[in-house]
Swiss-Prot record:
It comes from Panax ginseng (Korean ginseng). It is a single-pass membrane protein. One of its GO terms (molecular function) is monooxygenase activity. Gene3D superfamilies: Cytochrome P450 (1.10.630.10). Its EC number is 1.14.-.-. PROSITE patterns: CYTOCHROME_P450. Its main location: membrane. The chain crosses the membrane at residues 12-32. Heme binds at C472. It is found in: Membrane. The keyword Transmembrane helix applies. It comes from the Eukaryota. This is Cytochrome P450 CYP749A22.
Length: 524
């Protein structure tokens, strides 16, 4: 045996001991880090907040308060509501409703080991939403990332600013005006279908899903509902998966070793969305080439995105993945927001037929039986009041989240870095201290002198489309579409809730009627 071989034999146990020691040190480090994240840090944060007078339910090891939340939600959602009641806050967010009553306007609760500072004090809300640098958007959960990618809703910093400029250009006043004919044509198609249901029951929620899909497909992507149907179906399935996994705590890094059925399904849906949107992009590129105007992709939202993707200036250029992410975002937002808004307006007018008649008279006085026009839409005061009151009672998004970037003063409080802030829109919209004893009643007249007067100039009292620099860029698009649809429906039909309707609001991305919205149509 050579001396070299003897050296190898003698070194092997030493090397083994070294590797074993290194592994033990690494595992000890991982364990300490894990313990710090799931126990020491939460307990420290809980103590910091309690010393400042902020209370809340105690932290539970690893799961935080998620088990309590899931149990409360299961109980609150187990039965339908009285259809005359709009008190949906304790139904949709029973944990927040309960803890606000116990701990006051601002409190701390736990989403797994993550601290969530819930704020409903209006000055705190305003500061959180307006100071985007101090309180940026949170990184989306894994499932939400599959739904929206890194688009305008989830991106931050320079990327968000670049994408926001593009969206502002796509949805400015003149662009919206040019979209009106496509919106009208889509509503006409819907009303043509409704002729088969005259004097009978119809589920208008399903009808509005088709309508809004058609409108966003035509106006933003130059296609049709049928062209985008696969995309809408996949997005709907992703939305259901997201809702199913709300408040489920997952250990960090576990997905590297194990994927749940929902995660596998979400990845398949995400890939399918990417492929479908890529085909729409390729089709637009071919149309541009065939027209002989290479680089001219149209003036709609997709056209502006593709123009930016091919921009000669690298500072303005975006990637193909960026285009896909923005398309997903606008397919979701363009359908969800207006669908639920229209559904709840019809629901409320189906109950309050006096307001239905007031709205109809306003529409007929302005347009008669003529097609609505942009100038007339701006004069729909009663319809606008009804829309605002609907958005107050049934806001599409019932909470917003932000993150504390670094330790900061928040009024008299000191907030540690990385604490999550939750702003429950629904709680503020239903707050009797803001809106009075009739906060849970449908009273559009409260908006008769505008939003500012109704809220006593308090911007943080009513923000169905967000507040501050991150507010929804599609606000005017959604309300314009809703006004056109409502005006044309009121010209043709009166309606009342069907006896088969079950009042069971549920949150699946947005607040919607769980079992559809059945109404009885009567032609005028």
């Amino acid at each position: 045996m050579s001396w070299n071989n003897i050296g190898v034999v003698e070194m092997t146990p030493i090397l083994f001991q070294f590797l074993l020691s290194s592994l033990c040190v690494f595992l000890l480090f991982v364990f300490i880090r894990f313990l710090n994240d799931i126990w020491w840090t939460p307990i420290r944060l809980q103590r910091v907040f309690r010393q400042q007078g902020i209370r809340g339910p105690s932290y539970g090891f690893l799961y935080g308060n998620t088990k309590e939340i899931l149990n409360m939600r299961k109980e609150s959602m187990s039965r339908p509501m009285d259809y005359l009641s709009h008190n949906i806050f304790p139904r949709l967010q029973p944990h927040l409703y309960s803890w606000l009553n116990i701990y006051g306007k601002n409190f701390l609760n736990w989403y797994g080991p993550r601290a969530q500072f819930v704020v409903t004090q209006v000055d705190f809300v305003k500061e959180t939403m307006i100071k985007d640098q101090a309180y940026p958007k949170m990184d989306p959960e894994w499932f939400a990332k599959k739904l929206l990618g890194d688009g305008i809703v989830t991106s931050k910093g320079k990327k968000w600013a670049k994408h926001r400029r593009l969206a502002n250009h796509a949805f400015h006043a003149e662009s919206l005006k040019s979209m009106t004919p496509a919106m009208i044509a889509s509503v006409e198609m819907m009303l043509k279908r409704w002729k088969q249901h005259e004097g009978r029951e119809i589920d208008v929620f399903q009808e509005f899903k088709i309508l809004t899909s058609e409108v966003i497909s035509r106006t933003a992507f130059g296609s049709s509902y049928l062209d985008g149907k696969d995309i809408f179906d996949r997005l709907t399935q992703l939305g259901i998966i997201i809702t199913r996994n709300s408040y489920k705590v997952k250990l960090p890094g576990i997905s590297l070793f194990y994927k749940s059925n929902d995660e596998i399904e979400a990845e398949k849906l995400d890939q399918g969305l990417y492929d479908s949107i890529l085909r729409i992009m390729e089709k637009r590129e071919k149309e541009s080439t065939m027209s002989g105007e290479v680089g001219s992709f149209g003036t709609d939202f997709l056209g502006l995105l593709m123009k930016a993707m091919n921009d000669a200036d690298e500072k303005n250029r975006i990637t193909a993945q960026d285009v896909v992410d923005e398309c997903k975002t606008f397919y979701v937002a363009g359908q969800e927001t207006t669908t639920t808004l229209l559904a709840w307006v019809i629901f409320l007018l189906g109950i309050h037929t006096d307001w239905q008649e007031k709205a109809r008279q306003e529409v007929l006085n302005l347009f008669g039986q003529e097609i609505p026009n942009s100038d007339g839409l701006a004069k729909l005061k009663t319809v606008n009041m009804i829309i605002n009151e609907t958005l107050r009672l049934y806001p599409p998004v019932i909470f917003l989240t932000r993150k504390v970037k670094e330790e900061t003063k928040f009024g008299k409080l000191t907030l540690p870095a990385n604490v999550h802030i939750v702003v429950p829109t629904l709680a503020l919209h239903h707050d009797e201290q803001i809106w009075g004893d009739d906060a849970l009643l449908f009273k559009p007249e409260r908006f008769s002198q505008g939003v500012a007067k109704a809220t006593n100039n308090n911007a943080a009292a009513f923000f169905p489309f967000g507040l501050g620099p991150r507010s929804c860029v599609g606000l005017n698009f959604a309300t314009n579409e809703a006004k056109i649809a409502l005006a044309m429906i009121l010209q043709c039909y009166s309606f009342a809730l069907s006896p088969t309707y079950i009042h069971s609001p549920v949150q699946i991305l947005t607040v919607r009627p769980q079992h559809g919205l059945q109404v009885m149509l009567q032609p005028l």
